[in-house]
Design a protein with these regions (language model features):
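Polytopic transmembrane helical bundles with strong interfacial aromatic enrichment
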Residues: 2, 7, 36, 40-46
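Juxtamembrane membrane-interface segments at transmembrane-helix boundaries in membrane proteins
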Residues: 29-42, 68-85, 113, 140-153, ...
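Hydrophobic alpha-helical cores of multi-pass transmembrane domains in eukaryotic membrane proteins
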Residues: 47-61, 80-98, 115-132, 152-170, ...
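Membrane-helix exit/interface motif
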Residues: 62-68, 95-106, 129-144, 167-177
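Transmembrane-helix exit/juxtamembrane "anchor" motif
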Residues: 98-102, 170-177, 242-261
């Protein structure tokens, strides 16, 4: 046990009032706490992946079975690629890119950054394919572009998502940004990532409702199988978003800082507060 650990143990024992059971309680905390949190975390991550993957599968079944399948020919089958690509890209891959910092918390920071940026790039490419598909379909069918709230929200989300990816690339993967700039932009980057996930899910819900009203407006109130399946998709998307936000915002699931990151934090505090870094 290190000197710092012994000091921490002594402090906790003193807070316990020196009772005989205090050391036993402390030992139980050390032995069972991390394992219990780890198993809960693994279960929550697994549940999030099930929700996300099932959402993609439901979207594929909806568009493939009930809406005629997929093609790239300007027909309604090309439109069917739009919801599939958007759920896969802006929801599932986007959420997983955010989650890698929690799942791989003990891996080298540079590797996690590369994985984070790569998954986001795949999400961006997939989403662009989905947007091109719907624009092609509208052009071929002589349908006006960007007239609905769903289209406004979707295009705004995609543009901001693209900007977020470029800013992250410039600040965190390229070596040009200073430590002060990175530390300043990091909270904004994290907040924008979660906000964009919420926007993507909200826009998806608008799109689901819009598609149902266009396709089965007369039979939708009769609880048709297609309508029920699409409603379940919406519920799963919401649950996926809630679970992702929970995992990302819980303090105990945050990535523990390594010595290099702690040194950077001390350096940033010195720059902003004018104090001298404490010696170890």
């Amino acid at each position: 046990m290190t000197h710092q650990s012994r000091q921490t143990r002594a402090c906790l024992l003193s807070l316990g009032g020196g009772r005989p059971g205090s050391s036993v309680d402390l030992q139980n905390m050390e032995d069972s706490g991390p394992d219990r949190r780890g198993s809960v975390f693994a279960g929550l991550v697994g549940a999030s992946q099930v929700l996300g993957l099932v959402s993609v599968v439901i979207t594929g079944v909806w568009m493939g079975h009930y809406r005629g399948g997929f093609a790239w020919d300007g027909s309604a089958r090309e439109f069917n690629l739009h919801p599939l690509c958007m759920v896969l890209g802006l929801v599932l891959l986007h959420g997983d890119a955010i989650l890698v910092y929690r799942v791989f918390s003990n891996e080298a920071k540079k590797k996690v950054k590369l994985l984070h940026g790569t998954i986001h790039l795949l999400a961006l490419i997939t989403s662009i394919v989905g947007v091109v598909a719907v624009f092609d379909f509208h052009s071929a069918s002589l349908i006006p572009h960007l007239y609905s709230l769903h289209s406004w929200g979707g295009l705004t989300t995609l543009i901001l998502f693209s900007s977020q990816w470029v800013m992250g690339l410039l600040f965190f993967l390229f070596p040009g940004a200073s430590s002060w700039l990175r530390a300043t932009y990091l909270p904004i980057h994290v907040f924008c990532g979660l906000t964009l996930l919420v926007m993507a899910i909200g826009t998806s819900l608008l799109g689901i409702t819009e598609k149902l009203l266009f396709s089965i407006e007369s039979s939708y109130p009769q609880f048709t199988p297609e309508g029920v399946l699409a409603n379940i998709l919406g519920v799963f998307l919401v649950l996926f978003g809630v679970l992702l936000c929970y995992l990302v915002t819980r303090e105990e699931y945050r990535r523990p800082p390594n010595p290099e990151e702690e040194a950077l934090s001390v350096h940033f505090k010195t720059l902003t507060e004018g104090g001298a870094p404490a010696t170890p």
